[in-house]
């Protein structure tokens, strides 16, 4: 499928919208009331430091809603305002934050149901309004909705669209796209649908496995078993790893994406020589600025003397998980929570350890003066961060009184 031609056709359709409906000022006031925080504004103005009693808060200097998320949520709100009586669907969570998605449900935005792991679009009718989330949607979903005569509101983050352009460039010159990401993440599913031949690698370890196969060959069956869910139909590692281009899920760790790109570059130089590198390797910078800023801020924060870290964001949020990884790699006890409701009753916290299911920790807040690092993922409103801080302050005041 010529995905570029399809996008041009879709974008010129009168049923396609991605720039809002003229309700920006009204919606902006609504979003400020629902998601912004006066406390967080005060902490920012105070040099990202705050002390209450014997609790010192150190806030990362970049955290929370990014521009792409703000844009997506605002456009979803505008859609409801512009289509007050129409049936509105969304193909997936608008962002990975439970409170924001619940708010859309309260606004009568219906989520496409998933049956046996597959989205069921049978309930969508011609004339229905369908929102594409910030992560984007696969080209096949867009095609289905367009052919069904739906009004499509596209909130895809421009940084995600930039990655789509990169894999389309790979496809145009018959390069295989090596995508650093999670094969079952909505963004990577969408990105791979715009690629030609592709292989998805989760981390540097998997990238090394692939590069070793490029240099030395190996067990083809074992390779295919390892990447069975992470490659394009008909993928052949002996045929499809001769010319490769690098792309990434925008929320992955910046440093790891760069390492993977350099690893494949070195591998192709070793295999084919430096003079022929451009025949076998290409790479475009598709690392999201907002992701990079939040990771850089976290790397600065963990250099401070912190007793523990609280990372706030959806449990299925990739960028939030990577912020937690940074804390753990620097030896700081870290608690990943998705809302203030995870704290209490008493000195307990329900949190999600890295790559594990949620669990409960008792007596997580030490009974002494403490310094707590705070950050939040790109899908987390400031209001949620405020609620977490107030819960911590309330818990410490109760502990002090007792």
From Swiss-Prot:
It comes from the Bacteria. It catalyses: isopentenyl diphosphate + 2 oxidized [2Fe-2S]-[ferredoxin] + H2O = (2E)-4-hydroxy-3-methylbut-2-enyl diphosphate + 2 reduced [2Fe-2S]-[ferredoxin] + 2 H(+); dimethylallyl diphosphate + 2 oxidized [2Fe-2S]-[ferredoxin] + H2O = (2E)-4-hydroxy-3-methylbut-2-enyl diphosphate + 2 reduced [2Fe-2S]-[ferredoxin] + 2 H(+). Its EC number is 1.17.7.4. Gene3D superfamilies: 3.40.50.11270, 4-hydroxy-3-methylbut-2-enyl diphosphate reductase, catalytic domain. Isopentenyl diphosphate binds at residues 96, 185, 317-319, 379. [4Fe-4S] cluster binds at residues 66, 157, 288. Its cofactor is [4Fe-4S] cluster. One of its GO terms (biological process) is terpenoid biosynthetic process. CDD domains: lytB_ispH. (2E)-4-hydroxy-3-methylbut-2-enyl diphosphate binds at residues 96, 185, 250, 317-319, 379. Transmembrane segments: none annotated. The active site is at residue 187. Binds 1 [4Fe-4S] cluster per subunit. GO terms for molecular function: 4 iron, 4 sulfur cluster binding; 4-hydroxy-3-methylbut-2-enyl diphosphate reductase activity; metal ion binding. Catalyzes the conversion of 1-hydroxy-2-methyl-2-(E)-butenyl 4-diphosphate (HMBPP) into a mixture of isopentenyl diphosphate (IPP) and dimethylallyl diphosphate (DMAPP). Acts in the terminal step of the DOXP/MEP pathway for isoprenoid precursor biosynthesis. Belongs to the IspH family. This is 4-hydroxy-3-methylbut-2-enyl diphosphate reductase.
């Amino acid at each position: 499928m010529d995905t570029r031609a399809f996008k041009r056709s879709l974008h010129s359709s009168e049923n396609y919208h991605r720039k809002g409906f003229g309700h920006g000022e009204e919606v902006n006031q609504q979003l400020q009331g629902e998601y912004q925080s006066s406390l967080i504004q005060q902490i920012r103005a105070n040099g990202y430091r705050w002390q209450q009693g014997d609790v010192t808060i150190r806030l990362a200097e970049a955290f929370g809603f990014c521009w792409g998320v703000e844009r997506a949520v605002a456009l979803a709100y505008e859609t409801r305002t512009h289509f007050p009586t129409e049936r509105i669907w969304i193909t997936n969570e608008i962002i990975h934050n439970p409170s924001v998605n619940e708010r859309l449900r309260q606004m009568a935005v219906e989520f496409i149901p998933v049956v046996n792991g597959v989205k069921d679009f049978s309930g969508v009718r011609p004339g229905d309004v369908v929102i594409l989330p910030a992560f984007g949607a696969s080209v096949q979903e867009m095609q289905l909705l367009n052919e069904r005569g739906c009004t499509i509101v596209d909130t895809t983050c421009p940084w995600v669209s930039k990655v789509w352009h990169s894999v389309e460039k790979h496809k145009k010159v018959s390069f295989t796209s090596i995508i650093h990401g999670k094969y079952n993440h909505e963004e990577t599913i969408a990105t791979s649908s715009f690629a030609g031949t592709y292989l998805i690698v989760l981390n540097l370890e998997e990238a090394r496995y692939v590069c070793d196969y490029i240099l030395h060959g190996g067990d083809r069956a074992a390779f295919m078993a390892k990447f069975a869910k992470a490659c394009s139909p008909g993928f052949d590692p002996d045929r499809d790893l001769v010319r490769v281009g690098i792309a990434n899920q925008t929320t992955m760790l910046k440093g790891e994406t760069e390492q993977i790109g350099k690893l494949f570059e070195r591998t192709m130089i070793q295999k084919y020589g430096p003079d022929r590198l451009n025949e076998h390797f290409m790479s475009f910078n598709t690392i999201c600025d907002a992701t990079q800023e939040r990771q850089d801020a976290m790397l600065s924060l963990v250099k401070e003397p912190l007793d523990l870290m609280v990372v706030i964001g959806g449990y299925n949020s990739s960028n939030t998980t990577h912020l937690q990884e940074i804390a753990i790699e620097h030896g700081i006890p870290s608690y990943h929570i998705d809302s203030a409701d995870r704290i209490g009753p008493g000195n307990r916290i329900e949190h999600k350890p890295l790559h594990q299911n949620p669990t409960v920790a008792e007596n997580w807040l030490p009974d002494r003066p403490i310094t707590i690092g705070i950050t939040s993922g790109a899908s987390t409103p400031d209001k949620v961060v405020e609620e977490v801080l107030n819960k911590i302050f309330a818990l410490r005041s109760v502990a002090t009184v007792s």
